[in-house]
Amino acid sequence: MAFSPVKSRAGANCQIIFTGDVFRCIGTRPRKGGAMGKIYFDNGSTSFPKAPGVGRAMAELLERGAFNINRGGYEGAYEMAGRVLDTREMLAKLFHAESSRQVIFTPGITWSLNMFLNGFLREGDHVVVSGMEHNGVMRPLEQLRKTKGISYDVARTSSEGEVTAEAVEKKIGPKTRLVLVLHASNVCGTVLPIEEIGEVCKRHDVFFAVDTAQSAGTLSIDMQKANIDFLGFTGHKGLKGPQGIGGFLISPELDACVRPVILGGTGSHSDLLSQPEELPDKYESGTMNLPGIIGLHAALSYLEETGIDVIRREKEQLTARFLDGVREIPGVRVIGKQTMEHRTAVVSLDFPEMDNAIAAFLLEQEYGIMTRVGLHCAPLAHQSLGTFPKGTVRFSFSEQNTEEEIVRGIEAVKRITENRNYL
């Protein structure tokens, strides 16, 4: 990490910090946006606020007893096991899985992807991915390429982040065992046609894995309809739960081909030195994150009561309003799709006449607007979009945002591009 004290063209004494992914400008001036309150436009990183009841459920559990399941022979442990099972069943229903036993809990989707890829792929295997993938996919694949001799190809991806089923099919060869794609881009919000891609995989007898980090809780996902064999999810984004809890769902056919890579106590078959083969114990060794699971349960209850379709429509309305406002501002480029067709509530902007890090800094310092700037842990996506290595300023919205906040965001973007002192 390098530090370089500078004086910005905006006149602020600040420190530029380079982290290897993004330059960050830390200013010393008071934030003008604070008077009207901060505006959180970084829900693609983690949702805020969390669903009602999440914090309370977790706090009550910790205060009253987070008893380990499959260990204690007493009422509190049995009650906790029932609540964990309820959460599995809610997730199985959400993703249209055949059984709640297919739901595996992990610390998050990156953990899930690593467990799966390292337990499934063998020397000589070939994988097809899209050109929009996150490093949670690409880094494990690259490591396996170097250490296990697997190979992967990137399906043709448009400058708007679009990937067709035909493009995926063209990359499938005789050694292809897996197609792995994200459902929605964390950079520009483009939604991939997973049902069409799943049909291609079924036709070629290839396993199909989907990263739902940016779509779960916003878009309807049907594992069976889309022929999904592995579905990775995180609890803290669209599902509106706490950080540190996520997981995956796995089909029986794929499960038979995956070795568990984390072994240990499960509370079952304790007389054996070998890992249990049945689900979910096969992949759930050690003490589980029970506060995280209970927080996720509260979040899923909110989603069920509110309705994912309702949440999606509210997000789409806010995003469409923002897109309409920023598209016509001189000195700003909307990256990716220019309309709401096949996209989520994520908008990436490029400021050609200034450093994007400075733009994000000014949005927060001057107008109290929190965004994310840089490469978003997805350099492959930025290469596809033509924004590498500069990156973008990403705005990602929640149904908890308001029309007034969107208007303030548009006005802030307009002002920083109009003020020549910033350039």
Where is each model-derived feature located?
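Pyridoxal 5′-phosphate
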Residues: 13, 18-423
